[in-house]
Amino acid sequence: MAANVLIMAGGTGGHVFPALACAREFQTRGYAVHWLGTPRGIENELVPAAGLPLHLIQVSGLRGKGLASLIKAPLQLVRSLFQARRIIRELRPVCVLGLGGYVTGPGGLAAKLAGVPLVIHEQNAVAGTANRSLVPLASRVCEAFPDTFSSSAKRRTTGNPVREELFLETPRDSLAHRRPRLLVLGGSLGAEPLNKLLPAALAQVPAELRPEVFHQAGKQHAEITEQRYAEAGVEAEVAPFIKDMARAYAWADLVICRAGALTVCELAAAGLPSFLVPLPHAIDDHQTRNAEYLANEGAAVLLPQAKTDAAALAAQLTEVMMQPEKLKAMGTTARRLARPDATRSVVDICLEVAHG
């Protein structure tokens, strides 16, 4: 019978997609993967679709919640801890891997109490509350970006696990005989500030320099975004969401998007230059730190939302459209910063502590 591994990740795709990459790697090595999540996260959709058994505990975040939630917090933590401990006792995993989300707090503590090796992985350049609290309990601490955690014998810089198909091997065709292609990404829900900004900015780019545009606007905003482009006199293809991200990245020459950890690492994997507009109200401003990983090396342009209006973005776009060699150089730098071995490294570390 295959040995069990328990993965803890939930809430958003930024936690769940890297965890799914690790799950597939564990499976290729002959391990049975189980998943610990919460009832309200995106894992409820994605994990069963991947054919993985999903175990749920009742836990939610406290940051920014009211007094009533804070009063209930100790009881909720105790309840979720007992739920997680029961699941771990039943599964008897050789290792528990936590990749973020509220589930990792009680799940990680339960692993420690059960004597099961715990490995945590932080996707962002600024560690989340749950992962910070688990550092003393973990056997190994993996980070996507250098120096997210304080230096210690536990720390390993692995990069972010991303889908293998994003590591493009074939070079993009030359820009000598076609217009550059601009991909705008707003995430699964869309980014309304980008939906408003891009049509206005592209209208100010000279027509002869204007790129082809594919804009992912989110389900609720696709129609109004398409209308904005039409009113601005800018030709663009607008979609609510993108199913095949590998194909979209392969099509693009430049990406404008937020700076979520997974997105930043996918851009590096795809060797794509980018304009990054960090979410202004992200916890601990972690998206700015994520963006700096690429921007400080010249692989991206960091555009703070509060300081970026249509005219400023139009000027930036006009400049790079006139310099295709700059786009190519930025993409080459992005590829150099990629970590194609990230998934294997994280799984290697888990099995090292499990069997070491």
Swiss-Prot record:
Localization (cell): Cell inner membrane
Role, per record: Cell wall formation. Catalyzes the transfer of a GlcNAc subunit on undecaprenyl-pyrophosphoryl-MurNAc-pentapeptide (lipid intermediate I) to form undecaprenyl-pyrophosphoryl-MurNAc-(pentapeptide)GlcNAc (lipid intermediate II).
UniProt pathway: Cell wall biogenesis; peptidoglycan biosynthesis
GO cellular component: plasma membrane
PANTHER family with a match to the protein in the record: GLYCOSYLTRANSFERASE (PTHR21015:SF22), UDP-N-ACETYLGLUCOSAMINE--N-ACETYLMURAMYL-(PENTAPEPTIDE) PYROPHOSPHORYL-UNDECAPRENOL N-ACETYLGLUCOSAMINE TRANSFERASE 1 (PTHR21015)
Species in which this protein is naturally found: Stutzerimonas stutzeri (strain A1501) (Pseudomonas stutzeri)
GO molecular-function terms, A-Z: UDP-N-acetyl-D-glucosamine:N-acetylmuramoyl-L-alanyl-D-glutamyl-meso-2,6-diaminopimelyl-D-alanyl-D-alanine-diphosphoundecaprenol 4-beta-N-acetylglucosaminlytransferase activity; undecaprenyldiphospho-muramoylpentapeptide beta-N-acetylglucosaminyltransferase activity
Protein name: UDP-N-acetylglucosamine--N-acetylmuramyl-(pentapeptide) pyrophosphoryl-undecaprenol N-acetylglucosamine transferase
Binding site for UDP-N-acetyl-alpha-D-glucosamine: 12-14, 124, 163, 188, 242, 261-266, 287
Keyword Isomerase: no
Catalysis performed (reactions): di-trans,octa-cis-undecaprenyl diphospho-N-acetyl-alpha-D-muramoyl-L-alanyl-D-glutamyl-meso-2,6-diaminopimeloyl-D-alanyl-D-alanine + UDP-N-acetyl-alpha-D-glucosamine = di-trans,octa-cis-undecaprenyl diphospho-[N-acetyl-alpha-D-glucosaminyl-(1->4)]-N-acetyl-alpha-D-muramoyl-L-alanyl-D-glutamyl-meso-2,6-diaminopimeloyl-D-alanyl-D-alanine + UDP + H(+)
Gene: murG
Ranges annotated as spanning the membrane: none
Known EC number: 2.4.1.227
Membrane-related topology note: Peripheral membrane protein
Family: Belongs to the glycosyltransferase 28 family. MurG subfamily.
Predominant location category: membrane
Alphabetical keyword list: Cell cycle, Cell division, Cell inner membrane, Cell membrane, Cell shape, Cell wall biogenesis/degradation, Glycosyltransferase, Membrane, Peptidoglycan synthesis, Transferase
Example of a GO biological process term: lipid glycosylation
Taxonomic superkingdom: Bacteria
Coiled-coil regions listed in the entry: none
